[in-house]
Amino acid sequence: MPGCLPADSVGTMASLMPLSPYLSPTVLLLVSCDLGFVRADRPPSPVNVTVTHLRANSATVSWDVPEGNIVIGYSISQQRQNGPGQRVIREVNTTTRACALWGLAEDSDYTVQVRSIGLRGESPPGPRVHFRTLKGSDRLPSNSSSPGDITVEGLDGERPLQTGEVVIIVVVLLMWAAVIGLFCRQYDIIKDNDSNNNPKEKGKGPEQSPQGRPVGTRQKKSPSINTIDV
């Protein structure tokens, strides 16, 4: 039973000492053990806390949780340095390991701390992370950090194409070229067939008779006038 008394429960026991005449040793021992179990069930602090995707008015904070611990949520404390802007983001019933920070002031310094939420409460705050938002005209993130702060990871807005993406683009272009070539070939075949099916027009004159007169034409007779004298 003495093993149930953790070191951080000494203060609690000391605070209950004035009431010891009214409390039995068994009650004091149960209270101390319960406090020790509550502290033991709290999850550990997050690790590998980083800030990425820096923009003028937003950023993304991510972290990891040690394996073998039950975590049901997180709590993020955001503080703007040299100005108002404190915010606490809390979410439970989630297993996410990242959170977007929005509504930030451009070209300003911020610090964030992440806590894990377990079944018996929150963990101690994780390491304090410092980052600086970009200016409105900046495209590349500035990786400014104070001594002792965790280095902020910045990502470029324009990333190079991956090998798989290049292969897909080349395949699509080749397919389009093949379709266009097949269409042109079919068009030439159809055009040749149409030209072969049309009868050739040959100029034929009217048939001539052996005497050089057109056949099938009647020779016009000159009018004859008969005069009868009485």
UniProtKB/Swiss-Prot annotation:
This is Fibronectin type III domain-containing protein 4. The gene is FNDC4. Glycans are attached at N48, N143. The keyword Metal-binding does not apply. Pfam families: fn3 (PF00041). Residues 185-230 are cytoplasmic. PROSITE patterns: FN3. Residues 41-163 are extracellular. InterPro entries: FN3_dom, FN3_sf, FNDC_type_III_4/5, Ig-like_fold. The chain crosses the membrane at residues 164-184. Residues 193-205 have a biased composition (Basic and acidic residues). Keywords: Glycoprotein, Membrane, Secreted, Signal, Transmembrane, Transmembrane helix. Residues 1-40 form the signal peptide. One of its GO terms (cellular component) is extracellular space. Residues 43-136 form the Fibronectin type-III domain. It comes from Bos taurus (Bovine). Coiled coil: none annotated. One of its GO terms (biological process) is response to transforming growth factor beta. Residues 118-156, 193-230 are annotated as: Disordered.
